[in-house]
């Protein structure tokens, strides 16, 4: 499932950092959302507003020309996605990424990786798996959460973590949002690739838009009868064989190990790790699909497996790409390195511009969240912001809490001037104070 960790992510979340160290790349934080990639009221109600401060003020928008996009065959106007509405938290910076579909570009690292994975399944399972890479990222709250067993009160539903278009519609947090629909349509072997959206921190391995792949295979009783195994055991063994082959296809003859884990939508659940560049790296999350999901979609007698992985995380390792922002650059010095569309090309850095650091201290309010801060900073500085990091905090005798954040500005393509940085920082301070209701120090 795309909900299996892999960004996401935690993709929900399922791969961040060129070295993919266990504690820094495959972060556990989004486990319930992601296999990122998330037990069991199945309510379709949306989460309560957790970012009241942001919604208490009319969003400040940069002037943007009216735009009409086609997303998965659906035509969508900007004002249908970005609204001055208390139930909407989608900024222009996110709208600008819709429809770019980096994963469908054959000469882009994400497209190259996607094609390599598709090639593996086409070769190993000829004419079996149906592939989807152009499904609309606008989905219902029900599809995004309820259909994959995310509880109504789970933190992943909050406005602090998810981009809501309105109270019942979101930008998908994971490719698992399409799982139930595809099962209902009768698909039994499918791969889903797409862009997914999550409000997140700012550093070299996190970005609010990333890409996931979900894989599902459904078995009938006839498939395991006579094998001497029950359906769950049969599916689990088939799943491991499939994914071990995929890991070898991408990384070569590496040592592997399976880790038992927990996901709310699979049982049993596993993580696959490989020993690569002298580190154990988590590659993906997977498991045997919960029977409740199958029953809800008309497959009472079936058993299925599912997996999810994050493309950026794997691509950063396979191509030696050090900063997740590079996937979005149009600089020819980056794009030309992948013009042959081949797996295994190692990225050659073309700039070593130094970062510029600016510190900002303020007294926080009870409603303050770091994701809200990062959203404000990114909305002003865009991809010029490299990292937002908490470097100090304390609480005084009156119970007031102060945070000090260090913001690193750096362009991947050019040197930034002092005047430019100072102007950005001034705007950031102004907007943080106004939108987040903090008191600057």
What is each of the regions a protein language model found here?
Residues 105-108, 112, 141, 150-165, ...:
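Prokaryote-biased recognition of long, low-complexity C-terminal linker/tail segments
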Residues 252-441:
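A carboxyl-terminal module marker
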């Amino acid at each position: 499932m795309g909900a299996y960790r892999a960004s996401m992510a935690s993709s929900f979340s399922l791969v961040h950092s060129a070295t993919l160290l266990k504690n820094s790349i495959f972060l556990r934080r989004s486990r319930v959302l992601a296999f990122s990639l998330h037990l069991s009221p199945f309510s379709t109600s949306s989460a309560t507003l957790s970012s009241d401060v942001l919604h208490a003020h009319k969003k400040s928008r940069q002037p943007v020309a009216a735009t009409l996009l086609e997303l998965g065959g659906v035509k969508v106007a900007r004002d249908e996605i970005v609204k001055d509405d208390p139930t909407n938290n989608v900024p222009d910076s996110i709208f600008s990424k819709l429809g770019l579909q980096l994963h469908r570009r054959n000469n882009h690292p994400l497209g190259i990786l996607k094609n390599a994975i598709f090639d593996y399944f086409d070769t190993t399972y000829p004419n079996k798996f149906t592939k989807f890479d152009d499904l609309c990222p606008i989905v219902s709250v029900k599809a995004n959460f309820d259909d994959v067993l995310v509880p109504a009160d789970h933190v992943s539903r909050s406005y602090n973590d998810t981009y809501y278009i309105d109270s019942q519609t979101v930008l998908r947090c994971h490719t698992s949002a399409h799982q139930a629909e595809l099962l209902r349509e009768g698909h039994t072997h499918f791969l889903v690739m797409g862009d997914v959206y999550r409000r997140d921190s700012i550093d070299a391995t996190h970005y609010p838009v990333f890409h996931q792949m979900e894989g599902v295979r459904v078995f009938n009783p006839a498939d395991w009868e006579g094998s001497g195994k029950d359906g769950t055991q049969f599916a689990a063994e088939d799943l491991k064989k499939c994914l071990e082959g995929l890991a070898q296809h991408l990384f070569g003859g590496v040592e592997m190990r399976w880790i038992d884990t927990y996901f709310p939508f699979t049982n049993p659940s596993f993580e696959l790790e490989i020993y690569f560049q002298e580190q154990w790296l988590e590659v993906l999350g997977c498991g045997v699909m919960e029977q409740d999901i199958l029953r809800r979609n008309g497959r009472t007698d079936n058993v299925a497996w599912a997996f999810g992985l994050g493309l950026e995380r794997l691509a950063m390792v396979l191509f030696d790409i050090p900063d997740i922002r590079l996937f979005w650059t149009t600089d020819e010095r980056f794009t030309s390195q992948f013009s042959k569309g081949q797996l295994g090309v190692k990225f050659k850095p073309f700039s070593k511009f130094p970062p510029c650091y600016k510190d900002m201290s303020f007294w926080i309010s009870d409603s303050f969240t770091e994701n809200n801060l990062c959203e404000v900073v990114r909305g002003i500085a865009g991809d010029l912001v490299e990292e937002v990091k908490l470097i100090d905090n304390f609480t005084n005798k009156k119970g007031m809490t102060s945070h000090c954040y260090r913001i690193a500005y750096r362009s991947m393509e050019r040197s930034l001037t002092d005047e430019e940085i100072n102007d950005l920082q001034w705007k950031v301070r102004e907007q943080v104070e106004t939108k987040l209701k903090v008191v600057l120090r």
